[in-house]
Amino acid sequence: MLYRKPITVCLASCSVQETHGSACDVSSIAYDSRAVREGSVFFALRGTHAHGAQYIHAAIDAGACAIVHDCPLDTYVVGVYYARVPDARCALSSAAAAFYDFPTRALTVIGVTGTEGKSSTVSFIAQLLRLCGKRVGFISTVEYSLGDDILPNAEHQTTPESLTVQRLLAEMREHSCEFAVIEASSHGLSTRTARLQDVAFDVAVCMNVRHEHLEFHGSFEQYRFDKANVFRALDAHDHIKDGRRVPSFGVLWAEDASAVYFREATHKPCFFFKRGTGAEQRTAACLERMPCTLLWVQTLPQISQALRLRFVLSTVQEPAQPAQDGAHDVSVPLEGAFNACNIAASFLVLHGLLGTSLAAFAQHVQYVQPIQGRMQRVDMGQDFEVLIDYAHTPSSFEEILPPLAARVRARKRRMLVLFGSAGERDTQKRAMQGAIASRYAHVIVLTDEDPRGEDPMGILCMIAAGCEHKKLGKTLFLIPDRVAALRHIFSLARAQDLVLLLGKGHEHSIIYAHTVQPYDEERTARELLRASLSSDTLLS
């Protein structure tokens, strides 16, 4: 669909401080001068390494008829409309929403935040809504959908810029979607980026809050505050979508230390999930506001490769007398006990929006599929196990490594782990990652993740500082080249060992200072294993 709007309509909700030139109609919006075409409005955004004001003349040469900026300009080109605003990023979000006719006014929007589990939970919610017969689109780190096909997300951004968010939401509306599920990162929820500023959220989900992204937020408190913006957003509008009122609520993990903080960020009701059998006494402080809905989730002994869970749904009227809906067992074709919380949160979203019962949910959830790069098995016929996972934080290491290590110990074999840490990101977590991996892995291979502008070997040395009791060249290897690192860890693996490839997951590139190298972890692993098996066959 083609859009065209007067620039004054796009900027109607922005605090325009001054203008130069005559207003015009715009046919597209751009914040990258290379994307400008005839009739575009160009937003000059402040970036990490440069300011968009440097590219205003390039944008005009490419056909921009309007410029939105937040800094003083020395010259103004005749025939071009200029609008100065306090913050060009905030203005971009508002203008994009207006340009695309406010798409979230027609969509029931579910925002999923948290340090771990966002992408999987977004995917599970979208899959389950579809299994209930609903038209749904979604945006996540791994992939996105406008209602039909699922497409890979080629960017390294969890939440895209506001212009992309509004465009994708508009396309979901055009594809007759009723629901949109958005992975809401702390960056995207920050007022500094304003990427989700003009999204009318109806449901907010927070999986957990752990140590991450302090290089951007500056402190854990600011990190938590920014994440809670998705809960504050629930109180910002009336939840009337295309003339119908939709339910609005929050979903929280009762055991998380920040659950009370997030519950108090909204006046809307919150549903909770908690690990246990349902027989335990209520202990979570977040449950003090009653009545409240509480879902107990218990992990049952695994059969084959399916995750088996027992759910008990309670309505807590008072601490001693919760009303329970009986126990329901479900089987989900997923790896990893951590997915229990992701599935529990997904149920509460469906329960709150559609009134889905546990019995109906049990019928649907057996068809849920894992997403790429999350506990993904690679089997080329080798005699050892290979798993790929996106885990790249200390908390995600603590979540996945202990149960895998226990599984390996039970068969008296070894766990070999390959990972790195992103450059120009939180440096405090690097030694922590090394220390956690050292506790559970027999062999560690450190390699590039996304070094960006940092020295790759310098990053690996910072991780290695936490790898106590590992001997360099014996049980600890520093190999920046990721392909070479994979080749080496496969060469070390013995029969029945477990090889974990962490950090890249679904991503399709490695970012260096001056280049972006195409890279696919699954494809690379398959090619190396295939070559190794062919070589072994020839030698035998």
Swiss-Prot record:
<dbReference type="InterPro" id="IPR036565">
    <property type="entry name" value="Mur-like_cat_sf"/>
</dbReference>
<dbReference type="GO" id="GO:0005737">
    <property type="term" value="C:cytoplasm"/>
</dbReference>
<comment type="pathway">
    <text>Cell wall biogenesis; peptidoglycan biosynthesis.</text>
</comment>
<feature type="binding site">
    <location>
        <position position="33"/>
    </location>
    <ligand>
        <name>UDP-N-acetyl-alpha-D-muramoyl-L-alanyl-D-glutamate</name>
    </ligand>
</feature>
<dbReference type="InterPro" id="IPR013221">
    <property type="entry name" value="Mur_ligase_cen"/>
</dbReference>
<dbReference type="Pfam" id="PF08245">
    <property type="entry name" value="Mur_ligase_M"/>
</dbReference>
<dbReference type="GO" id="GO:0016881">
    <property type="term" value="F:acid-amino acid ligase activity"/>
</dbReference>
<dbReference type="GO" id="GO:0051301">
    <property type="term" value="P:cell division"/>
</dbReference>
<keyword id="KW-0547">Nucleotide-binding</keyword>
<feature type="binding site">
    <location>
        <begin position="158"/>
        <end position="159"/>
    </location>
    <ligand>
        <name>UDP-N-acetyl-alpha-D-muramoyl-L-alanyl-D-glutamate</name>
    </ligand>
</feature>
<dbReference type="GO" id="GO:0009252">
    <property type="term" value="P:peptidoglycan biosynthetic process"/>
</dbReference>
<dbReference type="InterPro" id="IPR035911">
    <property type="entry name" value="MurE/MurF_N"/>
</dbReference>
<protein>
    <recommendedName>
        <fullName>UDP-N-acetylmuramyl-tripeptide synthetase</fullName>
        <ecNumber>6.3.2.-</ecNumber>
    </recommendedName>
</protein>
<comment type="similarity">
    <text>Belongs to the MurCDEF family. MurE subfamily.</text>
</comment>
<keyword id="KW-0573">Peptidoglycan synthesis</keyword>
<dbReference type="Pfam" id="PF02875">
    <property type="entry name" value="Mur_ligase_C"/>
</dbReference>
<dbReference type="Pfam" id="PF01225">
    <property type="entry name" value="Mur_ligase"/>
</dbReference>
<dbReference type="GO" id="GO:0008360">
    <property type="term" value="P:regulation of cell shape"/>
</dbReference>
<feature type="binding site">
    <location>
        <position position="195"/>
    </location>
    <ligand>
        <name>UDP-N-acetyl-alpha-D-muramoyl-L-alanyl-D-glutamate</name>
    </ligand>
</feature>
<dbReference type="GO" id="GO:0071555">
    <property type="term" value="P:cell wall organization"/>
</dbReference>
<feature type="binding site">
    <location>
        <begin position="114"/>
        <end position="120"/>
    </location>
    <ligand>
        <name>ATP</name>
    </ligand>
</feature>
<keyword id="KW-0131">Cell cycle</keyword>
<keyword id="KW-0133">Cell shape</keyword>
<feature type="binding site">
    <location>
        <position position="185"/>
    </location>
    <ligand>
        <name>UDP-N-acetyl-alpha-D-muramoyl-L-alanyl-D-glutamate</name>
    </ligand>
</feature>
<dbReference type="InterPro" id="IPR036615">
    <property type="entry name" value="Mur_ligase_C_dom_sf"/>
</dbReference>
<keyword id="KW-0132">Cell division</keyword>
<keyword id="KW-0963">Cytoplasm</keyword>
<keyword id="KW-0067">ATP-binding</keyword>
<feature type="modified residue" description="N6-carboxylysine">
    <location>
        <position position="227"/>
    </location>
</feature>
<dbReference type="GO" id="GO:0005524">
    <property type="term" value="F:ATP binding"/>
</dbReference>
<keyword id="KW-0961">Cell wall biogenesis/degradation</keyword>
<dbReference type="InterPro" id="IPR004101">
    <property type="entry name" value="Mur_ligase_C"/>
</dbReference>
<comment type="function">
    <text>Catalyzes the addition of an amino acid to the nucleotide precursor UDP-N-acetylmuramoyl-L-alanyl-D-glutamate (UMAG) in the biosynthesis of bacterial cell-wall peptidoglycan.</text>
</comment>
<dbReference type="InterPro" id="IPR000713">
    <property type="entry name" value="Mur_ligase_N"/>
</dbReference>
<dbReference type="GO" id="GO:0000287">
    <property type="term" value="F:magnesium ion binding"/>
</dbReference>
<dbReference type="InterPro" id="IPR005761">
    <property type="entry name" value="UDP-N-AcMur-Glu-dNH2Pim_ligase"/>
</dbReference>
<keyword id="KW-0436">Ligase</keyword>
